[in-house]
């Protein structure tokens, strides 16, 4: 199986080709088609380094409504480091997806800067639980 077989649009396929991805990993083969075609949750388990971020991130990018400039997905991360890594990966996957805005929100960074970024039309928010809760309360 190759990535073009699992239902991703051409912009995403071009971005993952740039990253050197040729064939989906087992977790990606199972998760991506399911998440693209279903409106249900998925719980999956895989070892470190098996492509879990792409397994959930690529379908998120595929399904985002670009013309809706408001939050559509929140990805919660246990640490600031993982939040930044997932944001970097998502930005790489969305390299050719015009007008998609991904914002990282986490403690230890200026909250006003993060609020401005969110107010500018972020569709995907990647954040730590504490900062996400703080922002919701505001």
Specify the residue positions occupied by each region the protein language model found.
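Conserved pre-motif I regulatory segment
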Residues: 1-45
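Conserved nucleic-acid-binding Ia/Ib motif block in the N-terminal RecA-like helicase ATPase lobe
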Residues: 5, 10-18, 68-137
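Residues that scaffold the ATP/ADP-binding catalytic core of kinase and kinase-like folds
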Residues: 34-35, 63, 85, 135
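Conserved helicase ATPase motor motifs in RecA-like P-loop NTPase domains
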Residues: 27, 45-50, 74-79
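Walker A/P-loop
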Residues: 39-60
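Structured catalytic cores of enzymes that bind and process phosphorylated ligands/cofactors
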Residues: 21, 46-49, 62, 90
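Proline-centered helix-kink/hinge sites
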Residues: 24-26, 33-34, 59, 78-80, ...
């Amino acid at each position: 199986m190759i990535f073009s077989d699992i239902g991703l649009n051409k912009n995403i396929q071009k971005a993952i080709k740039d990253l050197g991805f040729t064939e989906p990993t087992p977790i990606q083969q199972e998760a991506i088609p399911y998440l693209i075609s279903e409106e249900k949750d998925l719980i999956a388990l895989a070892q470190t380094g098996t492509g879990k971020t792409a397994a959930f991130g690529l379908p998120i990018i595929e399904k985002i409504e670009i013309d809706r400039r408001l939050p559509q997905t929140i990805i919660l991360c246990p640490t600031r480091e993982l939040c930044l890594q997932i944001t970097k990966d998502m930005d790489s996957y969305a390299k050719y997806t015009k007008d998609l805005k991904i914002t990282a929100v986490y403690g230890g960074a200026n909250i006003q800067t993060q609020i401005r970024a969110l107010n500018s039309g972020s569709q995907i928010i990647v954040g730590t639980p504490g900062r996400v809760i703080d922002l919701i309360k505001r």
